[in-house]
């Protein structure tokens, strides 16, 4: 692996898991227990890893159908994730994607929703997964870190714009990475 492919791989995984940001902002208050402050990021991280494994398992079942067009499938799935991130960023800007959770079952559904991009891309991870078998660990760690850095952030008008910018930037970087994947040999 070259330095460029490592940097692109890290950026790709951060973009893929960036949907955690809009779903985890403001989930922990300053008066919550320390165990609550770490439990939520762990849940987000594990859901990213589990959904990546499920998507990869599904991808392995149907990979034989796409062997001749594998690079185009990877490109298309990167674009699908980029479009979903862009739509999510616009919904965040309108205030429609900020959540509060009162029950643990709601938290479970929220973490699954945050990991849906990872599931979608993992279907084609058979053909391209940055860092090979370490892809699943990297996705889990990235989901955990995104949640760890954002769960204690409180709601404010400026925060909504910043969260929207994170997801918008992730969608732009995902498109750039998709183009690099299809048209260059950097990845």
Predicted segments — roles?
Residues 50-57, 113-126, 174-187:
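Hydrophobic alpha-helical transmembrane segments in multi-pass integral membrane proteins
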Residues 64-93, 161-187:
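Selective transmembrane alpha-helices of multi-pass membrane proteins
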Residues 8-13, 21-31, 106-114, 118-130, ...:
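Generic transmembrane alpha-helix signature in multi-pass membrane proteins
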Residues 85-114:
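Alpha-helical multi-pass membrane helix bundles of inner-membrane/thylakoid proteins
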Residues 3-20, 68-78, 131-145:
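Structural signature of hydrophobic alpha-helical transmembrane segments
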Residues 1-7, 57-69, 125-135, 182-187:
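Helix-coil boundary and interhelical linker segments in multi-pass alpha-helical membrane proteins
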Residues 3-59, 126-127:
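Juxtamembrane transmembrane-helix termini in multi-pass membrane transport proteins
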Residues 22-36, 85-96, 147-162:
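C-terminal ends of transmembrane helices
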């Amino acid at each position: 692996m070259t330095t460029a492919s490592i940097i692109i791989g890290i950026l790709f995984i951060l973009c893929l898991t960036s949907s955690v940001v809009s779903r985890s902002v403001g989930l922990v208050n300053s008066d919550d227990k320390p165990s609550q402050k770490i439990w939520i990021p762990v849940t987000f991280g594990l859901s990213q890893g589990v959904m990546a494994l499920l998507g990869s398992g599904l991808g392995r079942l149907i990979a034989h159908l796409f062997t001749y067009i594998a690079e185009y499938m990877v490109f298309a799935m990167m674009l699908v994730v980029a479009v979903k991130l862009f739509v999510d960023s616009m919904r965040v800007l309108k205030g429609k994607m900020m959540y509060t959770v009162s029950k643990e079952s709601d938290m479970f559904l929220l973490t699954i929703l945050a990991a849906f991009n990872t599931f979608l891309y993992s279907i084609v991870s058979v053909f391209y997964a940055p860092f090979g078998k370490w892809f699943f660990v990297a996705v889990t760690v990235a989901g955990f870190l995104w949640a760890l850095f954002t769960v204690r952030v409180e709601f404010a008008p400026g925060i909504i714009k910043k969260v929207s910018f994170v997801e918008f930037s992730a969608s732009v970087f995902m498109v750039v990475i998709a183009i690099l994947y299809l048209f260059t040999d950097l990845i």
